Amino acid sequence: MRLPQTLVLLAALLAGSTLTAEEKLADGLYAEFTTPRGVFVTELFYQQVPLTVASFVGLAEGTLAPRDGKPFYTGLTWYRVVPGFVIQSGNPGLKDTGDDSIPHKFPDEFVSGLRHAETGMLSMANAGPDTNGCEFFVTLGDCTRLNYLHSVFGRTIRGLEVLPQIKPDDAFSIKILRVGAAAQAFKADPATFAALLAAGVKYSGAAEPGPATAFDDPAKVLPTEVPRAKNFNYKLANFQRATGRQIFARVYPAFTPTEEAKTPAPFTQQLAKSLGIHQSGVLAVYFADQDRWYVWVGDDLMPVFNPDHQKTMDVKNALYAAVKAKAAAYTELARAARGPDNPLKPADLAKYSVDAMLDLLLFQFESKPKS
């Protein structure tokens, strides 16, 4: 006999949704998720990303956008469950971030070091830059490719084993836990949210990729069913918004020699000059027919790229090898997920190579040079 969803959730509550003295948490702000499969707890990064956390806490506690006298986050279900990827919720009874019932929108908050690199990261769903509202997701594995596209604002510290057990349409509740004076003092009221919103750094990058933008795929080498080039451009523009550092990338079907650049290396250097990033930026160029990358690093960023003063070509070759390995891993995961009846296309393989290169470059250039 199958129990109604409400009884299953009640059973989970009675089984121990409240933390005991033995499970005492360190000072901080937390969200306790009670599901039919068990309880998991996420630490909220309220000091690093206060706007995002204020929205989440306000919607959970009812201080922002209450619905019918109850917190907005009442009656939630996990309406998107992708095994090995994410579980998603946040819009009661709805499944689309484009719906008019979203209580508010606010800009992204990207902080170096907050990454989708492991299971249990709590992050905002969106429909593009600065379209955060109420929907959030929790990662079910390494989702590094989501970095600088979605704002990470929490990390699961207890109950990781619960996450892969979540089923579509499982009901759940959220309880905010405040431990310590700083967490107790953190406000999520309309005035605080409005002040944080006014101080937010807005997206100023291009809406579409093009000749002068951070990313471009002029010949449409990458898949177009989902706008991959557009999303890669958002990612690199967001990285610059967060760090001040410019990383550009270009994808071409093949290299075409010119009088000025008879081989890919000088072509990449000349392109960096024409884009205005020759001295202070990074340019990665991919030629699909060779499945090969060429990277230019400006002198201003060379201490970050090569902090140990090795031969620059050795460092680049190590990067290229790491990209190959990471792209191969992405490819194998995709093949396994698709199965033999839905083989990968050349455009997909190019996409995984771009994922790998950008993941590694963003990780490298988040860091500071050695003193």
Each predicted region: which residue ranges?
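Bacterial N-terminal signal peptides that target proteins for export
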Residues: 1-8, 122
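Generic low-complexity segments that are intrinsically disordered, proline-rich and/or Lys/Arg-biased
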Residues: 5-6, 108, 265
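Bacterial N-terminal signal peptides
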Residues: 6-16
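Cyclophilin-like peptidyl-prolyl cis-trans isomerases
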Residues: 19-209, 233-234, 370-371
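Flexible glycine-/small-residue-rich
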Residues: 35, 126, 140, 251, ...
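Residues embedded in well-ordered beta-strands
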Residues: 135-137, 283, 294
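A structural boundary signal for the start of the first folded domain, especially the loop/turn
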Residues: 178-281, 289-371
